[in-house]
Swiss-Prot record:
Keywords: DNA damage, DNA recombination, DNA repair, Metal-binding, Zinc, Zinc-finger
Residue ranges of every copy of the Toprim domain listed in the record: 81-167
SUPFAM superfamilies associated with the record: Recombination protein RecR
Protein name as annotated: Recombination protein RecR
HAMAP family hit by this protein: RecR
GO biological process entries: DNA recombination; DNA repair
Biological role stated in the UniProt entry: May play a role in DNA repair. It seems to be involved in an RecBC-independent recombinational process of DNA repair. It may act with RecF and RecO.
GO molecular function: DNA binding; zinc ion binding
Zinc finger (C4-type): 58-73
Secretion signal span: none
Family in the record: Belongs to the RecR family.
Organism of derivation: Nitratiruptor sp. (strain SB155-2)
Length: 190
């Protein structure tokens, strides 16, 4: 049957490449697109093509942008004294959705001299006074934070990291030991 519906199976295989989409989900999506909403499928295809051809990395922070600078880096009302280091451009989106942070960001995806030089340039150009680490909690992240802090000593910055511990609504039995340990040792007065 695969040879007879080659284009359908090509669609299923393409959908399977997306995160969290397995073979069954890809098949359901393909059937829905082809049989029930072909116009929506064409709109989706156009939106994907438009996004892929128009979106690239911000030249300053490494986040997503349709221009040279992203909307955050080009916003003069942002708090330029605060710089949040994240591991991926997606992390910027997640933090922005919280509505709690109003400073700048820098995507620190890997430890290399080019990224470190870009980070130093951003600190100089914006008068950054505080670095906030928003990395996934791990021993490797802790080591990376210490390394970055050491490399940025010349700027006399204030270094902080986002709080971590027990997530809201999660039973203690389901919390990993590192998170529970940090939550206990970094407890706050109520």
């Amino acid at each position: 049957m695969k040879g007879k519906l080659k284009k359908f199976y090509n669609l299923v295989e393409a959908l399977e490449t997306l995160p969290s989409i397995g073979k069954k989900s890809a098949g359901r999506l393909a059937f829905h697109m082809v049989l029930h909403s072909p116009m929506d499928a064409l709109k989706l295809a156009h939106a994907i093509e438009d996004a892929v051809s128009s979106i690239h990395r911000c030249t300053q922070c490494g986040g997503l942008s349709e221009d040279e600078l992203c909307y955050i880096c080009s916003d003069e009302l942002r708090d330029r004294s605060s710089l949040c280091l994240v591991e991926s451009a997606r992390d910027i989106y997640v933090i922005e959705e919280s509505g709690e942070y109003h400073g700048l960001y820098f995507v620190f995806e890997s430890l290399n001299e080019r990224i470190l030089a870009n980070l130093k340039e951003m600190i100089k150009n914006n008068g950054v006074q505080e670095i906030i680490f928003a990395f996934t909690p791990s021993m490797q992240s802790d080591a990376t934070m210490l390394y970055i802090e050491d490399q940025l000593q010349e700027f006399h910055l204030h270094f902080t990291k986002i709080a971590q511990g027990v997530p809201t609504g999660v039973h203690l039995e389901n919390v990993d030991m590192l998170s529970l340990s940090k939550a206990i040792s970094e407890r706050v007065k109520i």
